Amino acid sequence: TTDIVAVDLNCLLYQLEITIAEAFQLLKQPLLARRYQTAAERRKEAILRYCWNAESQFFEDYNFRKGHTTGRRTLAGVFTLYAKIATSEQAAMVAHTIKQEFLKKGGLVTTLEQNGQQWDSPNGWAPLQYIAIMGLREYGYHGLANEIRDRWLAANDRVFSEKRKMVEKYDVVHAEAGGGGEYPLQDGFGWTNGVYAALYDEKERNRGE
């Protein structure tokens, strides 16, 4: 809905504004660099002001018509760690919620709602696992990041050993192939393969250190 200010989208726009500012700085265009730096700073302030729910201790989407957050905790909230927007205190609260409520047998569930839709429980998606893992690392939560990584890789391995293929999404509650939504589970899958390769390489590098 157009009433919703998405926290994950705004974190990505913040990162884009920072990148553009840095590019203009390299091109020796300080006025344009400052313009985008200022835009990024304003966006960060707005995310911290409007998307943090002090009651749930989590970052959420903001409903600007109602004047408050949606009250729904989803993995979109971890984009604030990935973009290094959250304070250290907020990151600690987010990490606690991730560990206590989102972490399942096969990785992180996307939301805490189970309604048969593919973007909700019990499904987990590769890009969001990656964002969460890297975001947690930005704030020093390497143990939790490793646990998520290892559970996700194990779920991928388990499904591959049974079906001889990678798939679009996974049921992380039961560590099996995902389901739900308006179309059949897709084989492949680009982001599943890419995230698996990146996390597997990271694990192997850490093992050698």
Labelled PLM ranges:
Residues 1-5, 42-124, 157-209:
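Extended glycan-interaction surfaces of carbohydrate-active proteins
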Residues 6, 117-141:
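Peripheral, non-catalytic segments that deliver or gate enzyme domains
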Residues 9-12, 36:
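Amphipathic alpha-helix face/heptad-repeat signature
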Residues 11-30, 79-89, 130-142, 195-206:
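Well-ordered alpha-helical scaffold segments within catalytic/enzyme domains
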Residues 16, 20, 27-47, 89-101, ...:
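Extended, well-ordered alpha-helical scaffold segments
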Residues 2, 6-9, 29:
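Amphipathic alpha-helical coiled-coil segments and their boundaries
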Residues 93, 127, 131, 144-151, ...:
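Short amphipathic alpha-helical segments
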